[in-house]
Amino acid sequence: MATVTNFKLVTPPESSRADKPGATKASDAFQEKKSVSVNYDRGEHEVSVNIGGLRKADIPRRYRIRVENDRFQKDWSVSEVVDRLMALNRWEEVDGVLNSWVGRFARKNFPVLIRELSRRGCIELCVNVFKWMKIQKNYCARNDIYNMMIRLHARHNWVDQARGLFFEMQKWSCKPDAETYDALINAHGRAGQWRWAMNLMDDMLRAAIAPSRSTYNNLINACGSSGNWREALEVCKKMTDNGVGPDLVTHNIVLSAYKSGRQYSKALSYFELMKGAKVRPDTTTFNIIIYCLSKLGQSSQALDLFNSMREKRAECRPDVVTFTSIMHLYSVKGEIENCRAVFEAMVAEGLKPNIVSYNALMGAYAVHGMSGTALSVLGDIKQNGIIPDVVSYTCLLNSYGRSRQPGKAKEVFLMMRKERRKPNVVTYNALIDAYGSNGFLAEAVEIFRQMEQDGIKPNVVSVCTLLAACSRSKKKVNVDTVLSAAQSRGINLNTAAYNSAIGSYINAAELEKAIALYQSMRKKKVKADSVTFTILISGSCRMSKYPEAISYLKEMEDLSIPLTKEVYSSVLCAYSKQGQVTEAESIFNQMKMAGCEPDVIAYTSMLHAYNASEKWGKACELFLEMEANGIEPDSIACSALMRAFNKGGQPSNVFVLMDLMREKEIPFTGAVFFEIFSACNTLQEWKRAIDLIQMMDPYLPSLSIGLTNQMLHLFGKSGKVEAMMKLFYKIIASGVGINLKTYAILLEHLLAVGNWRKYIEVLEWMSGAGIQPSNQMYRDIISFGERSAGIEFEPLIRQKLESLRNKGEGLIPTFRHEGTLL
C-alpha cells in the first residue's frame, strides 16, 4: 500500500512580513498555505497552494444573516472557488458557482480571485468572472484588477481587448499608473506593434508618470522583437539619460534585439562590452550568444561556450533552450549522431525536452530522409504527453518527401487535418517539394492550387519549389506558366527564385530565355550572386557558347561578386573547350592565389585542357599535385589522366591508375574501360584485356553503344577475334542495344582473319534480329569465296548464302559479280 505523507507550510506574503504583531484579520486571510503530499512508493510529490480569503465570519453582518440559513450558499475558500470554476465545461456559466459563494460579499476577495485565475492562464474563464464581478453591487473598480486583466490579455496576444480594458478603466474612474502602461506596452510588444508601444510611452510621459526600469525593458523588447534594433538602442540610450540604469534583463533584451535584427556580429561585440563592464551573464545571455555564433558559422566557439556552461553548473546551468540550440547547430552541420547525443544528454541531466527540442531532432532526421526514425520521434512526443504541433508534422512530411515517398507525405498532411492542426505555408511548400522533387509535377501544381483554395497565400519559396520541379521536367512551357502565376499573384521573385527559373530554362535548352530572364533580374535591381553566374556560365558551356561564358566572368568581377569553386571550374571548362590552355592556367593560378582551394572538378577541367592541347606531361604533373593536396580523383578525372598517359607514351601508368581506382573503389566508366583497352593494345597486354572483359559485366548496361563498338574494333584490329567475340557475347547477354555498325565491325574483322563460317553465322544473327545486311557485306563474302576460300569452300559459301536468302524471303538482294548470278 502506498505511503502518503501530508505537510502544511504557511508562507506569509511579502506585505504581511512587514506588518506589526497586531496584524488585521484580513491580512492573515490572504496568506498562502502550501500543502505538500509525498508518495514514497511511487517517488512522487505534489505541492499545492491554498488561499482562504475572507470567509463567512468576515463578511458584514447583514450579508451573514442573509446567507445563514440558505443551504445553497457555500463558505468556500478562494482556492476552492478557483478549482470549481476550472472544473466547469466551456459551455457552463460561471454564475452558478459564484452566486453560491459566500465570499462574494467581501470585495477584497475579488482581486485575489482574479490573480489566482490569471495564474492558471484560462483567459476566457477570467473574462467571464470579470464580467460577473462588475455587476455585483459591492464591486469597486481597482487598478490592480485591471492591470492583472491587461497582463493576462497580453500573454494571450489579445491586444485589442487589452486596449479596451485600458480605456474602460478610465471610464470607471481608475487612473492608469506605471504598471498599467507597463502591461499595455508589453501587450503591443508581443504583437510586434512597436510604434503603438512608443506612442504609449509618450502618453505616459505626458501624464507625468515616471517610467520604471520594467517599462523601458518592455519598450526595448517591443522594438527589438520586431527587428528594429536601432530603435531599441535609442530607447536604451534614453533610459540611461533619464537616470534609469540598465540591469541584466535590459542587456539580454538588447542582445535579443540584435539577434532578431540578424546583427549577430554586433551582438557578440555587445557581449564583450558586457564582460568589460563586469556584468555577470546568465543562462539567457549565453543562449543568445550560442545562437549568434551558430548563425555566423562559428560552431566551434559555440560548442566551447556550451561545454564551459556544463563545467560551471553552479554559475550558469544549461537549460532546455541551450541544449536545443546545440541540437540545431549539429542538425545544420548534418551531424545527426551528435544531435541525438545532445538530446540524450539533456534527458540524462534531468531536463524535460519540450516540443521545440523534439522538432529540432525530427528536423535533423528529415533533412536526411530518415522517415522511419522521424516517425519514431513523433511517437515519443505523444508517449510523453506532449501534443505535436504543425512543425512536428511538417518535419515528418518533409522526411517522407526526402526519402522519395510522396504518398506517405500526403498521408501525414491528411493526418494533420484530421487532428485539427492547420497546415501553414511551410507545410504546403514541403508537400509541393515532396511531389516536385520526385518528378510528379502535375501533383505539385495541384497542391499549389489547393493551397490557395485553403486560404494560404503562396510565397516565393512556393514558386522556387515549383520552378525546381519544372527544371527536372525540362519543359520551358511549365517555367513560363509558373513565372506568370507568380506575377499575377504579386509575388516578387528573389535571387533564389530567379536562379531556379534561369536553371530551369537552361535545363530545357532555352539559353536565350535564361539570358533574357537574367537581364530582367538586373533591371528589377535584384542582386545576382555567385550561384546565378555559375548557372549561366555552366549553361553557356553546355550550349557551346564559350565566349559568352567567359564574358560572365568579367561581369562578376565588375559587380565585385566573389568567385566560388563552381565558377572557377565552369570558366576552366570554357577555356579548355576552346583550347585556350594559357588562359585556363591563368584562371587556375588565380583560383589558388585567391585562397579558393581547387576541387576535383577544377583539376579535371585542367586535365581536359592539357589533353586538348596535347600537353601530356603537364597533365601528369597536375595529377601528382592532386595527390599531394589530398584531392581524391573521380572517374572523369581518372579517364582524362589515362588518356594523357596513352597519348603521352606512358601506357603502363594506365594500369597503375587502374589498380589505384580498384583500391579506392572508384567506379569504372566507359571512358575508363576504353583507355585501359587502348593501353592493352599498345603494350600487347591481351591477357590483361581478356581479364578486363570478365570485370566489365556489372558496367556493360551503362556503356554507350558507340563505346562498345570502339572496344570491339580495338580487339578486332589487333587480331584478337576470340576476345572480340567474347566481348560481343557479354554485350548481348547484358541487354545492351546493338546496331548495324556493331555487326559491320564483327564482319570486317572476321573476314580479315578468314573466318568465313563465323561471318555467315553473324549474317544469320542479323537476319534473325531483323537487321538487313548491306549489299557491301554480301559482296565482301562472295569476293572472299572466289579469291581466298579456294575451290573446295567457294561452292559451300554460295550454298549457305543461297539458303540464307531463302530464309530471308527476298531480303537478300540479287546482284551480279564477275559474271556470276546469285
Curated annotation (Swiss-Prot):
Single GO BP term: chloroplast mRNA processing
Alphabetical list of InterPro entries matching this protein: Pentatricopeptide_rpt (IPR002885), TPR-like_helical_dom_sf (IPR011990)
GO cellular component: chloroplast
Keywords: Repeat
UniProt-annotated stretches for the region Disordered: 1-28
Gene Ontology molecular function, alphabetical: structural constituent of ribosome
Positions of PPR repeats: 106-136, 142-176, 177-211, 212-246, 247-281, 282-316, 319-353, 354-388, 389-423, 424-458, 459-493, 494-528, 529-563, 564-598, 599-633, 634-668, 669-699, 704-738, 739-773
Repeat recorded as keyword: yes
Pfam families linked: PPR, PPR_2, PPR_3
Family: Belongs to the PPR family. P subfamily.
Name assigned to this protein: Pentatricopeptide repeat-containing protein At2g41720
Organism: Arabidopsis thaliana
Designated gene of the protein: EMB2654
